[in-house]
């Protein structure tokens, strides 16, 4: 059994590989499970690839106009300059960049206005211009105009500050919105990484909702190893069973054949038991089993005919043993070759996957860097939004004080801060617009990759770089298997070469002998089975029967059973005790001055009656009284009849039959109702004789040997079917459409959850920066107006 032990070693190797998979899954889980917090991932699977685009939000988004600046030549030699070319052709990116450059120059120039020298010069020039206008328009109505001017000033304050408040509110709203989309983008990145991690984990280990059910969406390397293990386990079981059944050693007696010989001895035991108990019934109780005597004769024929087929059985078993040994040799070679060719490839893929994941982990530190940088950016944005919020509160309070008259125009200390506000919003515009351009550029490149990948996956666009690759092959052949057809075809051919047809022919040839034997037995003996419980009077050497002189009484007594009912079987009829006694009472008591009954408690209580039981005697006084009242020539006949009926009652009550030779656990004798139970109202009660006989006959039938080898052949077929099933499962669950669907899912998660949110985020950042620019301009104007004009 060297081959058997070698396969056990291979089985241990598969377990070690599975352990490596679990360790690798643990490493991936430690690194990437962080991104799956609060995620409920249930990856669905659909055979229709087109349905995977139904929920593709990216393809239907109006933001697709942002991603139209690419050309095919950009990807002929894709590098950093290609990215710059795409961005240069994007009008939105370039407009934002130009605006940023121009505004930055203007902003830094306006900072000169806050210097004391420039501020003094501008104020002198403005004051000179104002003085000339004031002298020309000076009049005697200054007092009335002062009231009107105050009203106009307050209205101007209200309108101006209301505009500022609206812009600040819009700024905060756009800021909150872009923070919302920033968080969505962050979650999208987490979700995308989580999806990739989940799919990698499902590729390694069995993560199906029902671990026992193979699902294409979660078919994994562990499934492949489990399939290999199940093939080995099934093969070990078949081979071990063959070893236990001595099928691998032609010199060892075949157990079933030994049982076959033992079975014939059991038939002799049964025959002897029937003869022994029937002899007891005849000699001690003057009754007999007519059906059992027929069965005994049939057993003699069965034993004689069965022995003739023993030689045939020996020859067919020898031939089958030789065939099974050859089949095991073929299976051993096939499985060994499969392990030799396939296991290194699988382990190589697993090892390479582990190295790649560890390399990405060590190089990029994804888990640490992504949360770190996203949190820093988010915190920075929150800090940048705090000053606009405080300015908004300050202006609202300032407006309230102006309306209430607490602050005069010459005492507007808050207005002095407008220069600082302008400087802040200008700087905020530059910072936010820079972020916006960065995110917009990233989203443009990301969106371009989404559009290209969609067209590639739909086989609408091809790149030379993908030629002769697995992805290119699978896109063109969605239903093609990833595994080479030659591997599965050659393997299936080897498995299907296991031809057991010649075994079937030989076994079926010898089966005919035993089929004829079985049919002969059931034809001869089954007709007795329903009536083996019938007991009638013994004809030969029956002392009591011979005493009866009245022929009318004696003849019907011969076929009277031991039960009350009449029984018909075959072409014979057994008279029931009730019928017989009714006729007997009419004969011996024509004047109804007496009555004989049998096991009848009610009758026993009546006058001029005698109830026969197992304890009855012809010397009983009640019987003597009835006997004395009948014709004298019938009295001796009645005595004999009563004594025979006492034996009938004893047969019904006493334990007569010894079955220890049939059942070694049964030491005590049993009664008639147990030895040969009666079938009443269609109820089938199996006697120990019936059960023993049928079981023995079935067991000696060669069909048991046939069934055994059918079972062995079925086990080989189960092994073959299992291997074919696992190959089909592997092929079906590793088709190209699975790879394409996984790529579509990764693309869809990336484009919908990351690129689209990032594009929306960049739009709101630009809106925010434009609003900040307007606030910069407004505060700069107000500062210039209030600080340069004369008091």
From Swiss-Prot:
Coiled coil feature spans: 225-284
Transmembrane segments annotated in the record for this chain: 93-113, 163-183, 382-402, 425-445, 764-784
Disruption phenotype: Conditional knockdown results in decreased growth rates of blood stage parasites that can be rescued by the treatment with hepcidin, a specific ferroportin inhibitor causing an increase in labile iron levels in erythrocytes.
Location of the protein in the cell: Cell membrane
A single cellular component GO annotation: membrane
UniProtKB keywords: Cell membrane, Coiled coil, Glycoprotein, Membrane, Transmembrane, Transmembrane helix
Membrane topology: Multi-pass membrane protein
Induction record: Expression is modulated by the levels of iron ions in the environment.
Keyword Transmembrane tagged: yes
Protein name stated in the entry: Putative iron transporter
Lineage per the UniProt record: Eukaryota, Sar, Alveolata, Apicomplexa, Aconoidasida
């Amino acid at each position: 059994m060297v081959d058997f032990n070698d396969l056990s070693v291979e089985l241990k190797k598969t377990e070690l590989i599975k352990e490596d998979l679990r360790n690798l899954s643990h490493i991936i889980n430690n690194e990437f499970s962080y991104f799956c917090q609060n995620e409920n991932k249930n990856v669905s699977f659909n055979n229709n690839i087109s349905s995977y685009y139904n929920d593709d939000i990216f393809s239907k988004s109006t933001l697709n106009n942002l991603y139209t600046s690419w050309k095919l030549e950009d990807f002929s030699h894709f590098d950093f300059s290609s990215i710059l070319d795409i961005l240069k052709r994007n009008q939105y990116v370039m407009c934002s960049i130009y605006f940023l450059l121009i505004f930055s120059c203007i902003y830094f120039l306006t900072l000169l206005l806050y210097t004391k020298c420039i501020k003094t010069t501008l104020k002198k020039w403005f004051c000179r211009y104002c003085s000339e206008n004031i002298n020309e328009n000076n009049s005697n109505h200054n007092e009335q105009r002062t009231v009107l001017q105050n009203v106009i000033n307050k209205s101007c304050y209200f309108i101006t500050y209301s505009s500022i408040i609206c812009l600040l509110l819009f700024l905060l709203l756009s800021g909150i919105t872009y923070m919302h989309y920033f968080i969505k983008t962050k979650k999208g990145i987490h979700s995308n990484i989580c999806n990739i991690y989940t799919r990698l984990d499902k590729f390694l280990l069995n993560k199906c909702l029902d671990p026992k059910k193979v699902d294409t969406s979660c078919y994994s390397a562990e499934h492949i190893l489990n399939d290999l293990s199940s093939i080995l386990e099934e093969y070990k079981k078949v081979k071990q069973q063959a070893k236990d059944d001595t099928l691998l050693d032609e010199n060892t007696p075949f157990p079933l054949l030994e049982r076959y010989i033992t079975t014939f001895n059991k038939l002799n035991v049964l025959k002897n038991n029937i003869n022994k108990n029937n002899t007891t019934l005849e000699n001690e109780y003057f009754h007999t089993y007519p059906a059992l005597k027929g069965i005994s004769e049939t057993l003699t024929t069965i034993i004689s005919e069965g022995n003739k087929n023993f030689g045939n059985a020996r020859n067919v078993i020898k031939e089958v043993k030789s065939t099974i040994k050859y089949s095991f040799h073929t299976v051993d070679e096939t499985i060994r070759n499969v392990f030799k060719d396939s296991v290194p490839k699988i382990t190589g893929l697993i090892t390479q996957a582990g190295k790649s994941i560890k390399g990405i982990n060590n190089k990029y530190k994804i888990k640490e860097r992504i949360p770190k940088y996203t949190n820093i950016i988010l915190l920075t944005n929150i800090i940048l939004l705090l000053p606009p919020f405080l300015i908004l509160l300050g202006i609202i309070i300032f407006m309230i004080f102006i309306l209430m008259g607490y602050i005069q125009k010459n005492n507007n200390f808050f207005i002095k801060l407008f220069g600082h506000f302008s400087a802040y919003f200008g700087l905020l515009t530059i910072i936010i617009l820079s972020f916006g351009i960065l995110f917009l550029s990233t989203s443009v490149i990301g969106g371009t990759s989404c559009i290209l990948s969609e067209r590639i996956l739909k086989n609408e666009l091809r790149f030379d770089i993908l030629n002769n690759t697995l992805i290119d092959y699978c896109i063109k052949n969605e239903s093609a298997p990833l595994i080479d057809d030659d591997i599965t075809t050659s393997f299936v051919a080897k498995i299907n070469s296991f031809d057991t047809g010649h075994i079937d022919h030989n076994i079926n040839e010898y089966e005919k002998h035993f089929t004829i034997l079985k049919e002969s037995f059931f034809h001869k003996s089954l007709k007795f089975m329903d009536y083996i419980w019938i007991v009638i009077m013994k004809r030969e050497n029956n002392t009591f029967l011979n005493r009866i002189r009245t022929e009318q009484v004696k003849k019907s007594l011969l076929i009277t059973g031991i039960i009350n009912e009449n029984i018909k079987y075959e072409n014979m009829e057994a008279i029931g005790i009730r019928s017989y006694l009714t006729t007997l009472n009419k004969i011996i008591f024509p004047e109804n001055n007496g009555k004989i009954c049998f096991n009848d408690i009610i009758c026993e209580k009546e006058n001029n009656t005698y109830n026969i039981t197992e304890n009855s005697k012809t010397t009983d006084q009640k019987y003597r009284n009835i006997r004395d009242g009948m014709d004298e020539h019938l009295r001796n006949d009645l005595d004999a009849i009563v004594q025979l009926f006492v034996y009938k009652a004893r047969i019904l009550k006493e334990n007569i039959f010894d079955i220890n030779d049939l059942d070694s656990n049964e030491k005590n004798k049993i009664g008639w109702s147990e030895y040969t139970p009666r079938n009443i109202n269609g109820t089938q009660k199996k006697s120990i004789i019936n059960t023993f006989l049928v079981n023995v006959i079935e067991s000696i039938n060669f069909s048991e040997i046939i069934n055994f080898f059918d079972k062995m052949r079925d086990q080989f077929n189960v092994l073959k079917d299992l291997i074919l099933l696992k190959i089909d499962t592997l092929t079906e669950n590793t088709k190209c459409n699975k790879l394409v669907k996984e790529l579509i899912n990764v693309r869809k998660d990336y484009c919908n959850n990351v690129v689209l949110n990032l594009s929306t985020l960049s739009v709101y950042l630009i809106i925010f920066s434009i609003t900040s620019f307007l606030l910069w301009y407004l505060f700069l104007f107000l500062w210039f107006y209030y600080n340069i004009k004369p008091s």
